[in-house]
């Protein structure tokens, strides 16, 4: 979940991997729930949702952002996709985007080998790759 400066709460509902797709829903300050978009991973910085839609079995994943004030969507959020995304975070100080991934083994995500995190500039240009441990699905930043 994440919240924006206008006080809305955004919820990532994962669906059932069958006939109900994962989606983002908004709870506004009047407690009204509305569907926003399909996505499987989400983070928020200021009034921007950073989203990945990587449903099970998909042949391609989408990386995009939505300005929560205007509703405008930015497609192709990053210039170099990861193999099998499992986490996303945005540095609250720099705006850099971090996406974690499983490595692929035999054409499938490996849940037993080390994964990695790609770092992108705030405008989505790949800057660095970090090899990390197994299942790197959670990323966060500590505020001082």
What is each residue range found by the language model?
Residues 15-19, 55-60, 103-111:
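Short glycine/acidic-enriched loop and turn motifs that connect beta-strands
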């Amino acid at each position: 979940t994440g919240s924006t400066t206008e006080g809305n709460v955004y919820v990532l509902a994962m669906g059932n991997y069958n006939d109900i797709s994962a989606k983002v829903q908004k709870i506004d300050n009047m407690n009204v729930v509305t569907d926003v978009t399909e996505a499987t991973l989400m983070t928020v910085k200021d009034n921007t949702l950073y989203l990945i839609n990587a449903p099970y079995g998909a042949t391609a994943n989408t990386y995009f952002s939505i300005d929560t004030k205007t509703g405008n969507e930015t497609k192709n959020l990053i210039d170099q996709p990861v193999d099998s995304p499992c986490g996303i975070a945005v540095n609250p100080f720099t705006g850099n985007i971090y996406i974690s991934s499983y490595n692929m083994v035999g054409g499938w995500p490996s849940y037993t080998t080390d994964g990695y995190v790609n770092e992108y500039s705030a405008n989505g240009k790949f800057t660095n790759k970090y090899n990390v441990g197994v299942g790197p699905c959670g990323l966060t930043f500590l505020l001082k």
